[in-house]
Amino acid sequence: KIPMTAMPELVAGFHSLVGLAAVFVAIAAFLNPGAFNLGSPGNIKLGSLIEMSIGAAVGAITFSGSIIAFLKLQGIMSGSPITFKGQHPLNALILISIIVLTYLLCSTQSLNLFWFLLAVSFLIGFLIIIPIGGADMPVVISMLNSYSGWAAAGIGFTLENTALIITGALVGSSGAILSYIMCKGMNRSFINVILGGFGATDQSSNSQNKEQKPVKNGNAEDAAFLMKNASSVIIVPGYGMAVAQAQHALREMVDTLKKNNIKVSYAIHPVAGRMPGHMNVLLAEANVPYDEVF
């Protein structure tokens, strides 16, 4: 019952649950390592402790980051970038503190350090997402997808679960590759995405014209009539098609053009819509042939 336009929020919610599950498993393993064959409290195997710490940290970052992404997409929180002076140095300091805390935790196996590591990880997940604008959320969703995969893989090592390791690694690597491709399509830096270093606002929402203007209604045949003299047409669908649920009307227009021997194809930008593959799914709903999409 979730509309396609609300799918990014749903995906962000699922990512948050994956991250939270990784955190809970790490907590259970740290408090009761004997149940997972990791040793005894205060005497956990070093390798398992490193895996546990990394899985818990990445899981916490995924959880808090996904919650912020959900709030931004849902409109509960402003979709505009939220920045403040010294934000990047603070993020760098927190990331360094996570590394230091992980080292100290492996050395002392202190419960207080473990809780502090989780708290700091939750904080950095919040801080790296708030400066990203709503127009860039497709990249954020893909990046959080990657984070959730690595969190699952880290916990898979802790639990010695091969299936979880393989699945998490596949999700993590595919999400990272997709994020890189999307960043190239947007002319943005992949490193800045990881560090939460960019935040283009959605100009269409920030500069809305309040003036009321007349609306000209038309159907698929009217649109096709305007292009009747063309020999080839390339359609570039966007988020407006998703909001209006116009993919079926678009297909009707294309069918009319084809009857007039006009070649039609679809060009989809890597970050069109509000999540990766958004436009592809909508066109598939309208039974658009896949070989016409590029």
Predicted regions and their residues:
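C-terminal ends of transmembrane helices
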Residues: 1-11, 66-81, 124-137, 179-183
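Membrane-interface helix termini and inter-helical loops of multi-pass transporters
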Residues: 32-46, 75-80
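Cytoplasmic-side transmembrane-helix entry/capping segments in multi-pass membrane proteins
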Residues: 5-18, 81-93, 138-147
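Transmembrane alpha-helix boundary signature
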Residues: 1-7, 23-40, 108
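Alpha-helical transmembrane segments
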Residues: 46-62, 168-174
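Structured cytosolic domains appended to multi-pass membrane proteins
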Residues: 211-294
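Mobile "lid/hinge" segments at catalytic clefts and subdomain interfaces of large enzymes
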Residues: 133, 147-191
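Membrane-interfacial segments at transmembrane helix termini in multi-pass membrane proteins
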Residues: 170-230
